[in-house]
Amino acid sequence: MRRKIIIVIVVVVLVIVATITFFVIKDLQQEKSLRKEIDEIQKEMVDFEQIDVDKISKKLKATVTTGDYAKIEKAIKNYMADNLNTMLTISEALNDEVIPNALTAENYQNDGPDFVKTRKILKNTQDKLSASKETMIILSKDDTVMSYLKNVDDSYYIDLYKEMVGEESSVDDIKKNIDDIVNLIQSQQNVLEFLSENKNMWNVQNGKIQFDDDILLNQYNQLLVDDK
């Protein structure tokens, strides 16, 4: 009888050990899968000019883990998706051909003298960039980062999330770059406003703008200097 009891105890212990081992291994595999998944996405997002948006978007919507790991994965991916969308908005605004062509003789002829179309597009671009800058600032804050993680109380998973997302990041360089571009666009707006206000005092000849008044020419040239 005693021997049977010992055997039962041994079996129970082995089952418990096996169960614990199974879940430990499963957890390790899940964490490994999570780290690999996020690392691959981050690498694909490094070269933003060559980014495959559709491919990354699909990865950001899918999950490769379960349980609390899936909660972490979804939180990280939702955070990355919002960052990606903001960067895409900035990229789209910067790639608009109106910015480099706003102060060309061709545009003066096509959209002058009031430049309604050009000025509207430039204003929309300014607004998009300014809004995106504010979004980037908000996304960089710790409170915002943590708001993506929901229904997770275990400190281990919370710490893992913090580690993988990273601490509050600085967006000073991004802010400065956006501010510089917004200021550049505003300088272009100033030039177009000047030309619109003096619409009867200039024209385009042989691909160059000509003024009827040297004072206006000097003012125009000064505005161009301010634009650089």
What are these model-derived regions, one by one?
Residues 96-205:
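Extended amphipathic alpha-helical interaction segments
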Residues 189-228:
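Extracytoplasmic/luminal low-complexity segments enriched in Pro/Gly and acidic/polar residues
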Residues 23-36, 72-91, 118-140, 162-174, ...:
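Charged, low-complexity, helix-prone segments enriched in Lys/Glu/Asp/Gln
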Residues 1-3:
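Short, Lys/Arg-rich N-terminal segment immediately upstream of the first membrane anchor
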Residues 5-7, 18-113:
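Leu/Val/Ala/Ile-rich N-terminal alpha-helices, chiefly Sec-type signal peptides and the beginnings
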Residues 12-15:
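Beta-strand-dominated extracellular/periplasmic modules and repeats
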